[in-house]
Amino acid sequence: MPDIVAARRVGAMRLGRAELLSDLFNEAPVSIGVAGTSGKSTTTGMIGWILKATGCDPTVMNGAVMTNFVSPDEPFASSLVGNSGIFVSEVDESDGSIARYTPTVAVVNNVSLDHKSMDELRALFRDYVAKAKVAVLNLDNAETVALLVGARKAITYSLSNPSADLLAHDVRARTRWNLLRTDLTRRRGVRGE
């Protein structure tokens, strides 16, 4: 590849995608990393959309097209460049690059057998959660419940566990692709930060 040869010739640094992305993410004043063995892209897109719709102007890096951001100019909208200092990114465990991230907020949807052994996955997610200022954890998945022990501060969510900080109920899908309506109950003492 001519570009790599030219870069070597001038001594330019060469970074892989995970290295570059984690460096940018870790430098952000507020970083929200979305992890889990499934649902990362959808959750990243939802968080990005909520932040954008509420005027927060986030930067978002996703592993899939974010339907709400698709336009004629951006048909493959898997990223969004904002100007607020908030960086939302899908964080991947399959290649171990999750270990490179130090999030302000670590969201973990679920942990299940995928790409690595359960022991490896538990260690990766445990270390990821331990580095975050706040962990957002799904109480409907036993493996994410186990991550509570290592979290500095945790906010929990659930579709069925009434002890969760945030409990979604009466979930209704309106269309096949991108409209979901739910009622959310917040437990007393959980601030809306």
Residue spans for each PLM region:
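Active-site loops of AMP-binding adenylate-forming
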Residues: 65-66, 161-163
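Ser/Thr- and Asn-enriched, surface-exposed coil loops between beta-strands
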Residues: 162, 174-176
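Phosphate-binding loop of NTP-binding sites
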Residues: 1-153, 183-191
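A conserved short coil-to-beta-strand element within the FAD-binding core of flavoproteins
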Residues: 171
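A cyclin-like helical interaction fold
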Residues: 125, 158-160
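Short aromatic-glycine-enriched beta-strand elements
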Residues: 178-181
